């Protein structure tokens, strides 16, 4: 499943295609959304927001399209009039004079009023988004030490969208390697330096991935361009200590780590 950085880059692509342009055609597959088609003609997308792995498309009439791609959903940008050859099932079409965005295969799609936006179950449940520029390491540290999260093992905590939205498996693996911790650690057992390093890594690594992944220079480290240090690198040498990277399973997901320097 795509993680926060990939969802945000997808949102950027959608914004670049149709933001601010009047909608000339709107189509929804689901019957409960059909009544909104005419309401959106002539309106425009004001911005596309991400909340972890959910995407919120905001319109100028204050309606918001909520979509969660889950495992199979995917957005596509095409020139208006183009019909992609695909076996995927079309769910949403938002068309402007020159560009059209299409959502395929997703099943979790709703239209929300401003009031519903504040009470939506998923949006109420998710924690702060790691790509939110207003989220600080200090706030992350407070969440780590809160009664709700301080006794949780990182193996599960870093996959829990209620803790921080936008994290996923590759980020979990890379963050824990960066700070030299294992999935079995808990926030309550860390010293001040470890807590500080983890709070920064929980923001720095997702943001670096968002900014630079896809522009990878294999000779660069986390401080420059993003590349995987341990994810999918089992059997290779750890660049930090020379140990052998291993693969196991934690919280039902593949987990990669270096026993030589993560302890």
From Swiss-Prot:
EC number of this enzyme: 3.2.2.-, 4.2.99.18
Function according to Swiss-Prot or TrEMBL: Involved in base excision repair of DNA damaged by oxidation or by mutagenic agents. Acts as a DNA glycosylase that recognizes and removes damaged bases. Has a preference for oxidized pyrimidines, such as thymine glycol, 5,6-dihydrouracil and 5,6-dihydrothymine. Has AP (apurinic/apyrimidinic) lyase activity and introduces nicks in the DNA strand. Cleaves the DNA backbone by beta-delta elimination to generate a single-strand break at the site of the removed base with both 3'- and 5'-phosphates.
Reported cofactor(s): Zn(2+)
Catalytic activity: 2'-deoxyribonucleotide-(2'-deoxyribose 5'-phosphate)-2'-deoxyribonucleotide-DNA = a 3'-end 2'-deoxyribonucleotide-(2,3-dehydro-2,3-deoxyribose 5'-phosphate)-DNA + a 5'-end 5'-phospho-2'-deoxyribonucleoside-DNA + H(+)
Keywords carried by this UniProt record: DNA damage, DNA repair, DNA-binding, Glycosidase, Hydrolase, Lyase, Metal-binding, Multifunctional enzyme, Zinc, Zinc-finger
Name of the protein: Endonuclease 8
Zinc fingers (FPG-type) by residue: 229-263
Upper classification of the organism: Bacteria, Pseudomonadati, Pseudomonadota, Gammaproteobacteria, Enterobacterales
Record-level GO BP terms: base-excision repair
């Amino acid at each position: 499943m795509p993680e926060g950085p990939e969802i945000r880059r997808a949102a950027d692509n959608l914004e670049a295609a149709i933001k601010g342009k009047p909608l000339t055609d709107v189509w929804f597959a689901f019957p409960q959304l059909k009544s909104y088609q005419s309401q959106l003609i002539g309106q425009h997308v004001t911005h596309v927001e991400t909340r972890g792995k959910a995407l919120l498309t905001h319109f100028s009439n204050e309606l918001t399209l909520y979509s969660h791609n889950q495992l199979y959903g995917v957005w596509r940008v095409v020139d208006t009039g183009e019909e992609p050859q695909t076996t995927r099932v079309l769910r949403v079409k938002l068309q402007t004079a020159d560009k059209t965005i299409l959502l395929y295969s997703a099943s979790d799609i709703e239209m929300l009023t401003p009031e519903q936006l504040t009470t939506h179950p998923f949006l109420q449940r998710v924690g702060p988004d790691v790509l939110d520029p207003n989220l600080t390491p200090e706030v992350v540290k407070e969440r780590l030490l809160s009664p709700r999260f301080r006794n949780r093992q990182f193996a599960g905590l870093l996959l829990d969208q209620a803790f921080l939205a936008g994290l996923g498996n590759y980020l979990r693996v890379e963050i824990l390697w960066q700070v030299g911790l294992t999935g079995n650690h808990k926030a309550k057992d860390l010293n001040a330096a470890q807590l500080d390093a983890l709070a920064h890594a929980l923001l720095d690594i997702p943001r670096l991935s968002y900014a630079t992944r896809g522009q990878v220079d294999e000779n660069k480290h986390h401080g420059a361009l993003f590349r995987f240090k341990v994810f999918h690198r089992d059997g290779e040498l750890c660049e930090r200590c020379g140990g052998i990277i291993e693969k196991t399973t934690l919280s039902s997901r593949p987990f990669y780590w270096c026993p030589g320097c993560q302890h």
